[in-house]
């Protein structure tokens, strides 16, 4: 899923049919990359997509000086980092550990909260970017260029968990583009995820 976000206008979500894969430049032309402020690329790479397509999209976005938000993990994330450092990475705790802290085939690796905080801070400092690690019903751990943030989740009457992560990502990126305020962006993302959890319609925060 690709979202292109422009402040004061709508957010367009483009779901690409894996049976009709466009060339990378055609995808970004469809996104009107010169007209947007940021690009959010979320979800696992579908079968049929080339292994380097995510990294190429990131590279082109960053070459156009756009904020690039990565909401995926594993080999695709590592391949992208080798080619172009993301502005923002958002993954859950298990994905962070499996991507950055151990072999991707390892299982049942866990860390204390303090250990996890240190790893997020160090990785953010190394990559000189923002890393957000969601932890389900526990507070969200984040770091921006080595500065740590912790954001409590909102307690709601959840009726749906589908698309909560996507809602968080979209809310965070929208606020970050608008204000560049990390705390405000984390709060907006948290609010959007909570509203989605309260809705029977996944992806809806109205």
For the regions a protein language model found, what residue spans apply to each?
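A general structural detector for well-ordered alpha-helical segments in enzyme core domains, enriched
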Residues: 24-27, 53, 57, 119
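Conserved N-terminal subdomain of the carbohydrate kinase-like
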Residues: 1-37
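A short, aliphatic-rich alpha-helical micro-motif
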Residues: 33, 81-83, 125
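Conserved phosphate-binding/catalytic region of the ribokinase-like
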Residues: 59, 106-206
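Short beta-strand segments
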Residues: 8-11, 40-42, 71, 134
